[in-house]
Amino acid sequence: MLLTLGACAPFGTATVGSTRVHALQDGVQPAVSEALTNIEPARLKEALHAAGEADPASSPVNAYVFTLGGRVVLVDAGGGSALPPYQGQLAAMLRSAGYAPEQVTDILITHMHADHVGGLLDGSAMQYPNATVHVHAQEAGFWLSPALPERAPAQFRPLILAIQSALRPYTQAARVRTFDYGAEILPGIFAQDAGGHTPGHTVFLWKQDGAQALFWGDLIHVAGVQLARLDVGTRYDSSAPAAAQARQRWLAASAREGWTVFGAHMPYPGIGTVVADGDHFRWVPGPAVP
């Protein structure tokens, strides 16, 4: 595996093949462990303590940017102003990495929760006016349905409306492109089925210069708990059984293949590898040198 970690950068960087990837932290979500499901409170406390995590545990919100064949690619867009005061740093981080929002040509969306798409907006305008937003067809159909706000529980309506608002200027400008699982979105980047957390949750498998990497979105929210208990999900999962199956499938594949992993909610910069350890997995942050 070809991966190096930028030791002197003010933010995390890694090299996959010949391409440098910058990790961008949009912010931190507090008390995410309180949203975990299928685990008793006492067991949760034990798991957090054993992993050295705070109780309740917070979760970073990571996105990634890189240049590929003359295109500037952003994986997820953070929460922006949709989730104040905890998020909204992504555009500033992007500039620190040497990119202007106007340079971004493609945004790969793992799923359309607000902490991944809210940052598409700058006020009411497109934060990335020259970008095409790529999202799974079923995911877009679900979240952009005009009937969804009325069908949803009242406490979720503000977030749903924020999600729809974030995509609206891009859809109006014909800058949303949908895909199906298995599609090659950009050269060497393939959309893969990880549905369960949301209807069209997607992981992106990237094959570049003999190296392979996986952007796994929200497979894991609290690493210290879920790597050991793959059946533990969150109350935001659209299908807890499907989400657990996706976790098992993609963690096992990551460990087996030795992929570089980029995790949206893994400890910043969210770059590492996965190692099988009996019936569960361990996260190894940073570089893995062949």
Regions found by a protein language model. Give the residues of each.
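Divalent metal-coordination and catalytic microenvironments
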Residues: S18, F66, V75-D76, V104, ...
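Active-site environment of divalent metal-dependent phosphoester hydrolases
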Residues: V32, M112-G119, F142, E184, ...
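Active-site metal-binding loops of divalent metal-dependent hydrolases
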Residues: D26-G27, A77-G80, M112, Q138-E139, ...
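Metallo-beta-lactamase
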Residues: T15, G88, R95-Y99, Q103, ...
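Active-site metal-binding motif and surrounding structural segment of the metallo-beta-lactamase
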Residues: G69-R71, P84-H134
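Bacterial Sec-dependent signal peptides at the C-terminal "C-region" and cleavage site
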Residues: L3-F11
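Cap/insert and terminal regions of metallo-dependent hydrolase folds
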Residues: L205, D209-P290
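Conserved beta-strand hairpin/beta-sheet module of binuclear metal-dependent hydrolase folds
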Residues: P10-A97, V203-I220
